[in-house]
């Protein structure tokens, strides 16, 4: 169920799960070259590939209508289990959440999940080890 309307509170939510191996590259990894004394920023190939992967997966889950008001964005990053870790255990290794969120949120904004990313007034994000790797996303209108 990707979209539901709570008739009591008139809150709109949109939730989905993208089964995928989460790229290890983050938005923080943009590169800079100085050309004629001016810094020129660019995305290395690995970052472009990660952006494309997110865009392709997110495009399959676009809401029927873009969110135009304040939203709470919840993201759960589920990484494949390595070593002695168990399903559902918090992951305390790289990548850093803040850098991972930036790339994903930029892709969601570009695809039109919401009118502007300034409307994301609440952000809840966690990362876990999981038997099923991927990204769970829940977007909820708030007042």
Regions picked out by a protein language model, each given a short descriptive name:
Residues 1-143:
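Acidic, proline/glycine-enriched N-terminal capping motif
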């Amino acid at each position: 169920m990707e979209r539901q309307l709570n008739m009591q509170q008139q809150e709109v939510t949109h939730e989905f799960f993208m089964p995928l191996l989460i790229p290890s590259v983050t938005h923080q990894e943009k590169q800079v070259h100085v050309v004629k004394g001016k810094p020129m920023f660019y995305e290395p190939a690995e970052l472009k590939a990660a952006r494309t992967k997110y865009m392709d997966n997110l495009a399959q889950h676009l809401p029927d209508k873009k969110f135009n008001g304040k939203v709470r964005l919840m993201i759960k990053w589920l990484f494949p289990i390595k070593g002695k870790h168990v399903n559902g255990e918090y992951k305390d290794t790289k990548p850093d959440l803040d850098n991972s969120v930036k790339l994903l949120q930029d892709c969601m904004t570009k695809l039109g999940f919401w009118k502007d990313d300034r409307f994301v007034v609440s952000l809840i994000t966690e990362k876990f080890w999981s038997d099923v790797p991927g990204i769970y996303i829940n977007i909820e209108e708030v007042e």
